[in-house]
């Protein structure tokens, strides 16, 4: 029997608008939208939830949006800002697992089946990811947890905004029965209308049709529909990036005022780091990194070229870094660099 997969789908809430809201808090209590600033030919990219209460939606022509909400504030898109925020969020994903499949700037699938931390609980991992995103960006996202990509994506939309919805393997059958077929991956307006003409509106309706009938009516997609109606989706999470580093860090409630206090934290950090490392990571080490953040949020780091994870090297880096940054330390991070990068890149803060 194959191992039950644990898939998380993270979808940031009204991402472009939320980034703008964070940059300009005065927008928080006002209806506004991003994109579509040309009132005649523009199309809304996204909007905040206040604007949605007026009926404004993504991909809506600006002229219609303004009719629904005359006080709607329109902002130009700032993709540089969105990409920078997205990069921070994506790095958070990779700190939990290598198996990340980004779908866009604001959403991704993560396969956490083999993640040992958080008691190997996908629910606890999803909670931790959401919290880490909020801690580092001030933004909220919604998470869906399920045994496959199809259901994880559907689940992430259920408790928006800032939601978390879990579908366990035991709940799959009961969950899909009442699920509208329009929620299924690949079912657009044409397919939905075609299914409606066949008296199919829910997955339970769809389950009554044979595989042969669905293939006859929908071709190759008919096989997918047959499986999706039963909550079956064998699509893998396809990573698109080779991981360049693995790191862990701890923020401490009390300042670390001495070198000895910093060194005392090394064993726990080392254990956390090794628990995240795979056999391939050990084979690919090209550098070791230590970083500090002090109580004034000053950040410093040191990197050493190395082919193995050596506690002595980590200890020496902590000693050297402490001499350079003689302040009370609030955060310590340690990590490894992976793959083929040049010496100049090794000096970068991780």
UniProtKB/Swiss-Prot annotation:
**UniProt-recorded Gene Ontology molecular function terms:** damaged DNA binding; DNA-directed DNA polymerase activity; magnesium ion binding
Name a single GO cellular component. cytosol
- What are its cofactors? Mg(2+)
Q: What is its EC number?
A: 2.7.7.7
Domain named UmuC is located at 7-188
Task: Respond yes or no to whether keyword Transcription regulation is given for this record.
Answer: no
Which family is this protein grouped under?
A: Belongs to the DNA polymerase type-Y family.
The task this protein performs is described as:
Poorly processive, error-prone DNA polymerase involved in untargeted mutagenesis. Copies undamaged DNA at stalled replication forks, which arise in vivo from mismatched or misaligned primer ends. These misaligned primers can be extended by PolIV. Exhibits no 3'-5' exonuclease (proofreading) activity. May be involved in translesional synthesis, in conjunction with the beta clamp from PolIII.
Organism name: Francisella philomiragia subsp. philomiragia (strain ATCC 25017 / CCUG 19701 / FSC 153 / O#319-036)
Instruction: Tell me the gene name.
Output: dinB
- Pfam families assigned to the protein according to its UniProt record, in alphabetical order: IMS, IMS_C, IMS_HHH_1
What does it catalyze? DNA(n) + a 2'-deoxyribonucleoside 5'-triphosphate = DNA(n+1) + diphosphate
What this protein is called in its record is DNA polymerase IV
Residues the UniProt record annotates as site (Substrate discrimination): 16
User: How is its cofactor bound, per UniProt?
Assistant: Binds 2 magnesium ions per subunit.
Per its UniProt record, what Gene3D superfamilies does this chain match? 3.30.70.270, 3.40.1170.60, 5' to 3' exonuclease, C-terminal subdomain (1.10.150.20), DNA polymerase, Y-family, little finger domain (3.30.1490.100)
């Amino acid at each position: 029997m194959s191992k039950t997969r644990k898939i998380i789908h993270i979808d940031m809430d009204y991402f472009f608008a939320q980034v703008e809201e964070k940059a300009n808090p005065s927008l928080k209590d006002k209806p506004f939208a991003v994109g579509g600033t040309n009132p005649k030919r523009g199309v809304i990219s996204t909007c905040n939830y206040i604007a949605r209460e007026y009926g404004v939606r993504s991909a809506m022509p600006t002229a219609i949006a303004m009719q629904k909400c005359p006080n709607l504030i329109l902002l130009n898109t700032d993709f540089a800002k969105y990409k920078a925020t997205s990069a921070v969020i994506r790095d958070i994903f990779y700190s939990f697992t290598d198996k990340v499949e980004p779908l866009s700037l604001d959403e991704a699938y993560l396969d956490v089946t083999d993640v040992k931390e958080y008691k190997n609980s996908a629910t606890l991992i999803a909670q931790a990811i959401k919290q880490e995103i909020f801690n580092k960006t001030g933004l909220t996202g919604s998470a869906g947890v399920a045994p496959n990509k199809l259901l994880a994506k559907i689940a992430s939309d259920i408790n928006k905004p800032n939601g978390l919805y879990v579908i366990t393997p035991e709940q799959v059958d009961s969950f899909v029965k009442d699920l509208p077929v329009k929620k299924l991956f690949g079912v657009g307006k044409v397919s939905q209308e075609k299914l409606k003409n066949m008296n199919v509106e829910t997955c339970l309706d769809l389950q009554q049709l044979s595989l042969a009938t669905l293939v006859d009516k929908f071709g190759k997609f008919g096989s997918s529909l047959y499986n999706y109606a039963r909550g079956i989706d064998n699509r893998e999470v396809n990573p698109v990036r080779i991981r360049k580093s693995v790191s862990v860090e701890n923020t401490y409630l009390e300042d670390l005022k001495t070198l000895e206090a910093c060194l005392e934290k090394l064993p726990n950090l080392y254990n956390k780091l090794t628990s995240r490392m795979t056999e391939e990571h050990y084979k690919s080490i090209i550098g070791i990194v230590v970083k500090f953040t002090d109580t004034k949020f000053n950040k410093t780091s040191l990197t050493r070229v190395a082919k193995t994870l050596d506690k002595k090297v980590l200890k020496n880096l902590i000693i050297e870094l402490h001499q350079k940054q003689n302040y009370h330390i609030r955060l310590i991070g340690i990590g490894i660099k992976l793959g083929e990068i040049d010496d100049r890149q090794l000096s970068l803060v991780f």
